[in-house]
Amino acid sequence: MSLLTMVQQVTRRIGIASPSAVAGNTDEQIIQVLALANEEGVELAERHTWQSMTKEVTFTTGGAAKTITAVTKANPASVTSNAHGYSTGDQVDIADVEGMVQLNGNRYTITRTNANVFTLDDTDSSDYSTYSTGGKARLVQASQGTISSIIAAGDFDASAVRITNETMWNRTQRRPLFGPLTARAYQGLQASPVTGPFDQYRFMGNLLLFDPAPKGGETVAFEYISNHWCESSGGTTQDAWTADSDIGRISEKIMAIGVIWRWKQAK
């Protein structure tokens, strides 16, 4: 059932002329029915965890991987990574270095030398194997970015999307992330000198925050409920009716009953 056929069904039930088109129709009654249909779609979407609107998203923890091009045998070890963007005091995870493999899998606090070079605090690489090639550095950070940067932009509204609790897992570590934390619990963790033992998360300021800060480059997945309750005939999801050929992702029968109720309530 499309928007057009649903509205035609509604108009027959409420006793007004059925339209041949809805979108762009200038008849005041059809304009009102369309407005009521959009109201009904929004409210239905918020009332239930519809499986048709449930989606899964995966993302990679930490900042973008920065390519390492050189590492010195020195105290402290000096790392070359063009335009790394790091600041003194930042922590980075290093992986995939060839040659100087002793660096791999470890977390380092760094000192910025310049835009392309940083040193690894308290790391004497003088006796390490010689660096040959490759390597990635990732900034260790509690914030995994905005929700909108994690969830596909084409099916997202930060004010309406709902994350499904108890579905967030670190697939690399095969461990759950517990949450979302309350404000009190999260602030308590920030005040504590102890980290762990559980990985936890909180949403704040439209950011996804992890505690403790995860290792960079790991895959995390979770489910969420989209606020897009209809879609175009081509399958593009939407949060409002825009064309006669649009199709509901929620039962149009339920929507039609709701529109009829709204019409009668308004009269």
Residues covered by each model-derived region:
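Small/polar beta-strand repeat architecture
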Residues: 63-151, 216, 224
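Glycine-enriched, solvent-exposed interface loops adjoining structured elements
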Residues: 1-67, 136-267
